Amino acid sequence: MKAAPPSFTSYPSVLNLGHKDAAALFTVPLIVQEKIDGSQFSFCVDEDGDLHIRSHHNSINPDQPPGGFAAAVGTVKRLLGQLHVGWTYRGEVLAKPHHNVLAYDRVPAGNVILFDVAYDPDLYLRHVDMATEAERLGLERVPLLGLLYPTESAATNVARLQEIIDTTLSKLGGQKVEGVVVKPVAEGVVDPYGNLLMGKLVSEKFREVHAASGRPARVGDDIIQQIGGQYHTTARWMKARQHLREQGEITDTPKDIGA
């Protein structure tokens, strides 16, 4: 098997909008997409017709996928002859409606929903073209929830994003959206490390790390209790389960006890 095409790289980090490097996003027009509560999933086909697949953290053997990815890998295999050589398709996998934290009404068609298609390293199809490609393949794609413009202040745009989160039902039904991802309409907006710049805002339910009491630690508080109170949250526990599922360590059976 040849090495994966150049576009098959790790997906850039999506910065929280409070991150200092994310401020540059509000100087350019942005699209707003729904953030789906699934497992990140990328796939491409090389010039020899070989399939390359990865989750957020690991490569996936197409012939021996972890259980949580099996249905999505089966979908990709069926589409093998229709994929553009050298393009990397990126999406979220949901093995079942309650894949991670949110319990949706349904899974996407084929258990994978696209959010980006790269035709070269750091060069992505526009949302409208990504939607056309998804339709050609018979896959779903995340919805476009709005546009933001630099003529508005960052505070105004963040308030608009929060309103979207608070009022928008997920494409998959059953829940309000987990959050939103914002991306530049045009290419060439990068972070200090040269990676494509993107940002996210998630609902309060998904704020992973915060002080359990909301107050500063007192002198004399046990440091282990302080750390435990900060990190022992439902969202962080669910994220740990997600990582175990991506690694094939969780099967949703009694065997999971002790995982």
Predicted regions and their residues:
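Core nucleotide-handling region used for phosphoryl-transfer chemistry
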Residues: 1-259
